[in-house]
Amino acid sequence: MYAVIVTGGKQHKVTEGEFLKVEKLDVATGEAIDFDRVLLVANGEDVKIGLPVVEGAKVTAEVVSHGRHDKVRIIKFRRRKHHMKRQGHRQWFTEIKITGIQA
């Protein structure tokens, strides 16, 4: 059984027991969270597609940890001017474990 959920402006295909890194959520570590925006639920041959969401479906997850991704380096360069600007960015994430899918 799997589902497609929306969180942080992105769509994720999830299965029960899977660990997933999503955009930072303001939930404490160890707490449970419900995702109500479920676009698709599939259980073998039984597939439910939402318009735009599946009514009554929800995915429950547990927050495992918070952290930051690896650094992404940005370089802005102007030709012939001896100008180079370097910048780095580390995006925050929340790691979750999918504990249940209900359709």
Curated annotation (Swiss-Prot):
Keyword line: Ribonucleoprotein, Ribosomal protein, RNA-binding, rRNA-binding
Coiled coil (UniProt feature): none
Keyword Lyase: no
GO cellular component: cytoplasm; ribonucleoprotein complex; ribosome
UniProt key word Lipid biosynthesis: no
GO biological process: translation
PROSITE patterns: RIBOSOMAL_L21
Binding partners and assembly: Part of the 50S ribosomal subunit. Contacts protein L20.
Record HAMAP family: Ribosomal_bL21 (MF_01363)
Known role: This protein binds to 23S rRNA in the presence of protein L20.
Family recorded in the similarity comment: Belongs to the bacterial ribosomal protein bL21 family.
UniProt-recorded name of the protein: Large ribosomal subunit protein bL21
Organism: Pseudomonas aeruginosa (strain ATCC 15692 / DSM 22644 / CIP 104116 / JCM 14847 / LMG 12228 / 1C / PRS 101 / PAO1)
